[in-house]
A protein has these predicted regions:
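Conserved nucleotide-sensing/catalytic segment adjacent to the nucleotide-binding pocket
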Residues: 1-53
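A glycine- and Lys/Arg-enriched "phosphate-lid" helix/loop adjacent to the NTP-binding pocket
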Residues: 3, 69-115
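A structural signal for well-ordered alpha-helical scaffolds and beta->alpha junctions
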Residues: 5-13, 104, 117, 121
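Catalytic cores of transferase enzymes with a strong primary signal for eukaryotic protein kinases
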Residues: 23-28, 40-41, 45-46, 94-102, ...
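Flexible, active-site-adjacent loop/turn segments at secondary-structure boundaries
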Residues: 26, 31, 61, 112-113
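ATP-dependent NMP and nucleoside kinases share a basic, alpha-helical "lid"
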Residues: 37-88
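NTP-dependent small-molecule kinase module
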Residues: 65, 69, 86-90, 112-148
Length: 148
């Protein structure tokens, strides 16, 4: 329950987004959070003009009818791995550098299996490059209408 096997938490995302759609607000605590000592909840106040659900699983097939727009950020695997390991090491999120590398290799193996089965980019309305492309200023991004 957001501590389940990678990308097998679609039922939680469906439950949260369904509640948000029907009631206009959300205060959701994934069932596993208290068991793992995680406090708080995922809260969206009534009247929020939009909600961003972030992550590689945010556009999964199971929620396609519950989201209005899907944006796919296309990034080279090596660049994503390097950024993730650097960020997690700097923040201490997944331990030291060695533990972060181990986590990221585990994560990327699960992510690749999810991508092969679900192909979320095929439902994307907009594709954004996750890498700086030649000729763009620092405040510019490259994008195209989806799907890929």
């Amino acid at each position: 329950d957001w501590n389940e096997p990678l990308f097998r938490w679609d039922h939680l995302l469906v439950a949260a987004l369904s509640e948000l759609r029907s009631s206009g607000s959300l205060d959701f605590t994934p069932p596993a959070w208290p068991r793992h000592g995680r406090k708080g909840s995922i809260a969206v106040a009534a009247g929020a003009p939009f909600v961003v659900v972030e992550g590689t699983g945010a556009g999964m097939r199971a929620v396609a009818d519950l989201i209005d727009v899907c944006i796919w950020v296309q990034t080279d695997d090596d660049a994503a791995e390097e950024r993730g390991i650097r960020r997690d090491t700097e923040e201490g999120t997944n331990g030291d550098a060695e533990e972060s590398v181990r986590f990221w290799h585990w994560w990327m193996a699960g992510e690749r299996a999810f991508f092969a089965a679900d192909r979320p980019w095929e439902r994307a309305h907009l594709i954004v490059s996750g890498e700086r492309l030649p000729g763009l200023a620092d405040n510019e991004i490259a994008w195209a209408e989806g799907p890929i």
